[in-house]
Every structure is written in structure tokens, then in C-alpha cells.
């Protein structure tokens, strides 16, 4: 659409005609607005179909994050016999949490701060269904952005009505002004184009380039990039320089430009586990869902193009070799770190004339562990878990040891396989879960491993899953300081222009038990979050912490006088990658296998959803697809408008 056509289209849609200024204003403000819609793929007779099965069928859901929980809840309500399998000892995925001992007390911790936006329609519905009320949330007082080279910009709760929402953002900015924004005609067009989001066209035209290139080619006003687009797009957990321009447009459409809800979001007054995940787990069990925590799905059992069972890890569950490694690669002392073709990290060492091998996945969340020279054991940087040289947990959230693997010599090679009951110090009996339907709702890494070990016959599907990627690693550094930081007026800040810090959260200002601890001790609890660390900035932990501390001092100078009484540093990589070109290879909810479905924020869907809402939405989509197979009523799913207001 050319500029002239666009303005003709705009005037027509807005109701603007010659000599009709009043009607134009009414048309613009009244009719031409984003409105909540419904994503409905059911047929015309959907309401006439039964809601539940008369005879239960078995469904296995793999993954206990938001996608798996939402799918399990919907299937259980339809009278399916649901088993949910989660490798971690707790549910929640990226919302999971655990307790630590610090300063003589127990504190809950998690992966980092989460804001809950009003347009998370499906997520909020799921919370409400589990009895999670408004008392667990408080409204954020604003959306402040700290810049490295100028004053803080505070974006308050913006109006929900277009064009006042975007004009409000510009008006609230100290750096931007309406006239300079409107005068920058060449750079205004690509911004307006972001209001033209339309799934097919947007991904056809813009998925081949990154968002920064899109902005620079379009000559977007640099001040608008620095003040609005860059800090907000970083929250995708993908750097603007490697984020697909099409995905960025979907993101901004969902969160702001196409949302009927403005910038409003809520924060929780308790930790994620007690406020959200535990009530959801109780709701699942009340509906009859069997929840298996600490059990890993090893592979799917396939027969005649269907999944007949899900095989869980355990003694006797071997499914061929895990890895084959030349003996010469194993060092004389220390451990060899090896990544198998299926993406499984393996640790191998010499023990005299014999060999020992461990599964290198942390038993907390499956992140790769690394040998720690100072202790002789292993460290998981994701959640600061530690294991001794035998693989037994010694600190942090992991409770189970690293699984022992079998090692067999074959000439000059070592063949690494799943442990037999005689070689593993901890024996877990293998189990096969028969199923009529299966939903894979794991994260990217877990799904890749599962499908690789399943070895499905459809190479196209296997290739799609294998191509899934994770974003650059992110860092969460939470510190307990011995004094408050009085200049912190907000509980949460977005940050722009620093090497690492992308946001900073003051937990002691809004969440228990940190509020009480701060009152008793006179201190504060602060969390610095780096959303996506560029490859050139991935450095040893002490260097990153030192730099982030300097950034804290720059943002809040009074912190220079504070002493860190306790700290937790986590660095991990488990958020979905949204790189240029990824979209075309991304698998959808339905697969080439009649009873196998996928769910997660990484799953392709035409609906304008993102992050947590995408996880819950695709979980519900999977349940709807299964319902269609059984001629059951499908649930219409609320969404923001499918298209931008200028589409």
C-alpha cells in the first residue's frame, strides 16, 4: 500500500469526509479502535457439540510450564484422563521458583521479574479458573525507563484509545515532541506501518530482516528508536539487532499498537510459586490430572503414524546410545564436556583404567552444568545449583543427583548409553504411559531432545523441530543490600543504554517476604536483569557482576555506599529465539501425526499472541484440536485484534 492509498484508506475507515470534521473525530475516536476479538476455528455447529467425552480417553501432556498446564486443564475439563509429565521437581516453567536460605532466613526466588498485562486474556482466564484473584496482584504505577545518557522517562498508564495512546507516549517523553515526530516524514511511515500488522503480509514482507535494520532503512527518528522501540523490544528476550522485524511488529501489535488495553500491567504481591503455580497445580489435581514431577519424557513410542505411548526415563528405558566419543578426547584429568547429536550434554572422565559418565543436565531445570575447578564438582549457572564430584547435589535448588550413564568401550571409541539399574546410584523405574493423544509442551531445548530421541519418520517435521533455537543467554542478579535506595520511586524500571542491565526491580517495595525483611533490617532487595547478552559480552561471572554493579551505581548513586549482604547470580539460555527467517520453519500446533500436538510460545500460530500469553493460547489450541478429533465443542479463545488498525 502506497502512502496516498494509505491515507485514503485511513480517511475512509475513520469516517473522515470533506466538511465533516465532527464526524471525522467521532469516527476516529469511536469506531476506528482496537477491539478484543475471538479466535475461533470451530465450525458453525460448534455450540451443538458435546462438551465432554462420555468415555474418557488418555492424554499425556509433556511439560509443566504454562503451555502444558493450560492444555492439561482444558483436556481434564473435557473428561480426558490426563497425565502431565514435568522433568523439573516443580511446575511452572519460566514462572517456576524455589526457596533459598539467606541471612538465616528462607526466601523464594525465581527466574526474574514478570509483568502481567491486561491483554493476557487466556492467561488471566486460566488464573481466574484456579481461584487466583485480584488480591494477588497490584497495578504497576507506571512504566519508567532509565537511560544511560539522559534523564529517566516515565510513561504512565496510557489511554486505551487510538491515537491518544501513541500521542500520550510521545507527549510524556522529555526527548520526543509531537512536532518533531510528525515532521520526520520519512521516518514516520515505518512507524505507521507498524499499525498495519497483518499476519500473512507482515511475515511475507518483513521476516527476512532484523528489527534494527527495518528501523534504519526506514529512517525512523533515532530518538524514537532509543526512547521507545529499543527498550521495549528488548523485552522479547531477543536483541533488536537479531530480532525478526515481523516478530517485532507482532510484538508491538500485541502489547501496544493493536491492544485495546494500553500499557496497563500488574505485578504479583507474592512469589510466582505460591501466588500462581501452586493454585494452578491444585486446580489440575482437583480435576483428576495426574501430575508427575521430576520425571523426564525420554521419547515417544510411535506406531503406524501415531503416538501410542510416552516413555519416561529410568532403568531399562534405554533407547540406543546417547553419544559416541573417541577415547583420545577424554583428558587425563578433569572432565570432557560433550554435546550429543540429540543435544544432550554429557560429562566423561577417566577413573584409572575405567571410565565414568554423567548426564550433564541439571536435575532442577535441565540446564547444562559445567565442571567447577575450585570445588572439583559441577555448577549450574542457571540457578546457582552445585553438585559434588560424584554428581550429588550440595547447594541450590537441585534435589536429585546427576544421572549416571553407562560407558562401553568399542575399540578406540566410548559408547555412552542410558544407565542400567546396576550402574546408577539412584534407580528410577522406567515407565511407559499409553496415550490416545499427546501434547508436547516442553521448552525449545526439551522438545528438540525429545523429538531427536524419538526419531520420527517424517524428516520435514523432525527438521522443523531441530531448527528451533534459543535466544542469547540472559542474566538475573538479585542482591540483598544493607540500606534502601531512596531515589527509586518505582518498583520496576526498564533500562536502556547499558552493557548488561535491561531492567531493575525493587522486590522489597511490592512483594513479600522482601517487604518485611526490608522493614526489619533497613535494607532493600534489588534484581538486575540482562534480557539477552550479546556473544561478545558473554564473560566470566565475576566480570559480568562487576559491570552490573557499576551500572547499578550509575543508575542509583546512593548504592555506592551499600554493602551486598547476599546475592544470587543466574545466567541461562531458555527463551525462544525470534530470528529473521525462523518463522517459516517453525512447527504449528498440529503435526503430521494425527494424535500429536505442540504447545508453547515457540509454536507457530496466526494469532497475535506473545510470550506467556502465547504459551497458554497454544496450550488451549492443542486442546481444541484434540476436541475437534473427538467431535467435542471447541473453546473460542479471546485475542487482541487479528489485524492492525490501519491494515
UniProtKB/Swiss-Prot annotation:
Residues 322-416 form the Rieske domain. It comes from the Bacteria. One of its GO terms (molecular function) is 2 iron, 2 sulfur cluster binding. Binds 1 [2Fe-2S] cluster per subunit. PROSITE patterns: RIESKE. Keywords: 2Fe-2S, FAD, Flavoprotein, Iron, Iron-sulfur, Metal-binding, Oxidoreductase. It catalyses: a carotenoid beta-end derivative + 2 A = a carotenoid phi-end derivative + 2 AH2. Disruption phenotype: Mutant lacks chlorobactene and all its derivatives, and accumulates only gamma-carotene and its derivatives. The growth rate of the mutant shows no significant deviation from the wild-type growth rate at any light intensity. FAD binds at residues 67, 86-87, 94, 120, 601, 612. This is Carotenoid phi-ring synthase.
